[in-house]
């Protein structure tokens, strides 16, 4: 609790730095120098942070707060070490994920990581430059990134259920999907408490339509799906038509599908009804592509928030930049990761607020450049559209909070979001590395539990624990 409070205090102070950092004279950045050591399933150790601040005392305050923030969002602290393994999952060979038995289930990792980080100048009384006053060279960042992202997702092949179940990241995908299911379900319920019918949703970066069934189960009335990749949009629309045409199908929402770059194009100009308002905008594993420049990030937020009704929500998942930078600074090179995922930065020590590019690769499924998202900056920018941050948790914090609910726990089992450990005689574990399951083996020895346990391998947990969930509410 103390760590959480400290993290919130740090972010409030950091917002002022974020405002002052973006100026027209030089690129804004913040510098972090950490000495950390690998420990257990994650990274831990004492952190030293160097920032440009006006006094040594304030710098020390920021250092201490960032240490707290890093430890709370990392997976290496002693109190968090067991993470997912205590959850018990019986073997259910015929269980599928929440997305149903359709052969066109969502390829969970069409959605990709993102981040958040630390800030530069700490002088709050210094001139406070408006966020719009971004350096000219930020405005002239190289063209082509958006088309590269679109091309990458257009080239991804649809994979059937059988092949997907054999993937090294099968449980990782299902776990990420469970996180989204719980997040979407929770905020649909909040909307339903305010209005009983005619719920309208904008799915920003819908991919191939992996969340369609979630919206159907949420009994919404209208869905607008947008994505930068035209092939993905066509597959999403086909998946919707397949759902609609099933003989046993219940009522399904109406939908429209738009191919557009939400960071460069104004979506209301493409809506059938430009006056349409939304109750929820969902942006899952997408925000980070927009932080190439201020203009792109602002356009993404405008598209996400401008047409939200008062009391509506902007929800999503995005990488935790504090965690990304912490792991980077702990690495001896400009990259970090394991056999499942890799993150490679261009250099260490200088992390601009916009255009801080890194390459992310996930098991051959995702391989595309992304940009850090400094969350206090995202929070500050969202205020322009009358949005208030009402929820923010790391994936670990979110899991530990939501798994206490029996419905969520049953959904976790149905979706096969955790791997049964130990494997039975007719199956094998997804990882051949013994140390990938040391945490589960240790838990078995120290606790009287019903077997098999449900867990993620160490490698999978390292990959998924770079994310956080968030929700903003539109104010009156």
Curated annotation (Swiss-Prot):
* SUPFAM superfamilies the record matches: S-adenosyl-L-methionine-dependent methyltransferases
Tell me which EC number(s) this protein carries: 2.1.1.56
**MF terms (GO), sorted A to Z:** mRNA 5'-cap (guanine-N7-)-methyltransferase activity; RNA binding
The record lists the catalysed reaction(s) as: a 5'-end (5'-triphosphoguanosine)-ribonucleoside in mRNA + S-adenosyl-L-methionine = a 5'-end (N(7)-methyl 5'-triphosphoguanosine)-ribonucleoside in mRNA + S-adenosyl-L-homocysteine
List this protein's GO terms for biological process. Answer: 7-methylguanosine mRNA capping
The principal location of this protein is nucleus
| Marked site: mRNA cap binding | 208, 214, 239, 288, 370, 467
Tell me the residue numbers annotated for binding mRNA: 176-177
- Disordered: annotated span: 1-128
Annotated keywords: Methyltransferase, mRNA capping, mRNA processing, Nucleus, Phosphoprotein, RNA-binding, S-adenosyl-L-methionine, Transferase
The UniProt similarity line reads: Belongs to the class I-like SAM-binding methyltransferase superfamily. mRNA cap 0 methyltransferase family.
- Return the protein name: mRNA cap guanine-N(7) methyltransferase
Q: Which organism is it from?
A: Macaca fascicularis (Crab-eating macaque)
Q: What lineage is this protein's organism placed in?
A: Eukaryota, Metazoa, Chordata, Craniata, Vertebrata
Q: Could you tell me the gene encoding this protein?
A: RNMT
């Amino acid at each position: 609790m103390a760590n959480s409070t400290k993290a919130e205090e740090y972010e409030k102070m950091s917002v002022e730095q974020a405002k002052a950092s973006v100026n027209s004279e030089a690129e804004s950045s913040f510098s972090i120098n950490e000495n950390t050591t690998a420990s257990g399933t994650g990274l831990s150790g004492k952190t030293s942070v160097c920032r440009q601040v006006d006094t040594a005392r304030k710098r020390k305050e920021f250092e201490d707060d960032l240490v707290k923030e890093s430890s709370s969002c990392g997976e290496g602290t002693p109190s968090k070490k067991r993470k997912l393994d205590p959850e018990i999952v019986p073997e259910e060979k015929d269980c599928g994920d929440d997305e149903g038995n359709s052969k066109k289930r969502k390829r969970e990792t069409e959605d990709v990581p993102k981040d958040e980080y630390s800030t530069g100048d700490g002088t709050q009384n210094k001139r406070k430059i408006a966020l719009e006053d971004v350096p000219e060279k930020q405005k002239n960042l190289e063209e082509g990134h958006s088309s590269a992202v679109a091309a990458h997702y257009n080239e991804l092949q649809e994979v059937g259920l059988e092949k997907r179940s054999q993937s090294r990241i099968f449980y990782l995908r299902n776990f990420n999907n469970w996180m989204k299911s719980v997040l979407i379900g929770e905020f649909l319920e909040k909307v339903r408490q305010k209005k009983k019918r005619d719920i309208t949703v904008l799915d920003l970066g819908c991919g191939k339509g992996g969340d369609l069934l979630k919206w159907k189960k949420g009994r919404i009335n209208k869905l607008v799906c947008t994505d930068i990749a035209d092939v993905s949009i066509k597959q999403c629309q086909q998946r919707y038509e397949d759902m609609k045409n099933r003989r046993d199908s219940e009522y399904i929402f109406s939908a429209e599908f738009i191919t557009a770059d939400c960071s460069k194009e104004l979506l209301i100009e493409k809506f059938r009804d430009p006056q349409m308002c939304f109750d929820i905008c969902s942006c899952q594993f997408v925000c980070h592509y927009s932080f190439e420049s201020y203009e792109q990030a602002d356009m993404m937020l405008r598209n996400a928030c401008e047409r939200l009704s008062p009391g509506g929500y902007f929800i999503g998942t995005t990488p935790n930049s504090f965690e990304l930078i912490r792991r980077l600074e702990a690495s001896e090179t400009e990259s970090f990761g394991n056999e499942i995922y890799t993150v490679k930065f261009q250099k260490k020590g200088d992390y601009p607020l916009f255009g801080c590019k890194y390459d992310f690769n996930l098991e051959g499924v995702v391989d595309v450049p992304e940009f850090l998202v400094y969350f206090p900056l995202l929070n500050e920018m969202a205020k322009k559209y009358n949005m208030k941050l009402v929820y923010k948790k790391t994936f670990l914090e979110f899991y530990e909070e939501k798994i206490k609910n029996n419905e969520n726990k049953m959904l976790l089992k149905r979706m096969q979001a955790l791997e049964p450990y130990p494997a039975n005689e007719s199956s094998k574990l997804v990882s051949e590395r013994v140390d990938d399951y040391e945490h589960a083996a240790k838990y078995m020895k120290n606790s009287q539990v019903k077997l098999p346990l449900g867990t993620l391998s160490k490698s999978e947990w390292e990959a998924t624990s770079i994310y956080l969930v968030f929700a903003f509410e539109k104010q009156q």
